[in-house]
A protein has these predicted regions:
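Loop-helix junctions at membrane interfaces
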Residues: 1-198, 202
Length: 203
């Protein structure tokens, strides 16, 4: 009987059925949390977001490919949200440059998966602790790169439009990181450290 040859490695699917399923499920959860408002937790002075948590979960459960895919979809959803109902900062970024706005929304979300995967695989501690640490780092990556990208790309034009110094814009962004980013990171770390997350398996 003639053997059926296996397809060459380069023609194999980029993602397995399991990875595609997890990516779709977590992307759907991200969009649901954003549309319904359940992805925002009211704190004393602001709202913390947990929209990045599905990206972190996907990275830990199924590896960096899934994390990147969910992060891209998270970023695309954020970009579409800026077109529909932008915040004051993102409204300016959108008016200044649609490409800059897309970069600010999407690229930091991709980096979440890269940071989470690197830390989760290398930390020499128990699963719950390294999950919490990786989640905190992933959340801070999202906040710092998002606001940092805004500052680098449109910080100077924003300062000129508002009649303030670039240093004042930088101070404002640092304040947002402290007031929003740190509580969000702590919330993410606590939530994920309490969830049992299994090791990603080779398929």
């Amino acid at each position: 009987m003639e053997k059926i040859s296996q397809p060459p490695q380069e023609y194999r699917s980029f993602m397995s059925v399991r990875e595609l399923t997890i990516s779709g499920l977590l992307a759907g959860i991200t969009i649901f949390l954003g549309i319904t408002g359940y992805g925002f937790i009211p704190l004393i002075v602001m709202n913390a977001t947990i929209l990045h948590i599905p990206t972190i979960i996907g990275t830990i459960v199924a590896g960096p490919k899934v994390g990147v895919v969910v992060g891209v979809l998270f970023g695309l959803f954020s970009f579409l949200q800026t077109l529909r109902a932008p915040s004051l900062l993102m409204q300016f970024a959108l008016q200044y440059s649609v490409l800059y706005d897309a970069f600010i929304c999407i690229v930091p979300r991709i980096c979440i998966a890269l940071v989470v995967w690197a830390l989760y695989r290398r930390l020499p501690c128990g699963t719950a602790l390294r999950t919490g640490i990786a989640a905190v780092a992933g959340s801070l990556t999202n906040t710092i790169l998002f606001l940092g990208s805004f500052f680098l790309l449109v910080g100077a034009p924003y300062a000129a439009a508002r009649g303030i110094s670039v240093e004042a814009v930088g101070a404002m962004i640092l304040g947002i990181v402290g007031m929003n980013g740190v509580p969000e990171a702590l919330v993410s770390g606590i939530i994920l450290s309490l969830i049992h997350i299994s090791e990603p398996t080779r398929l």
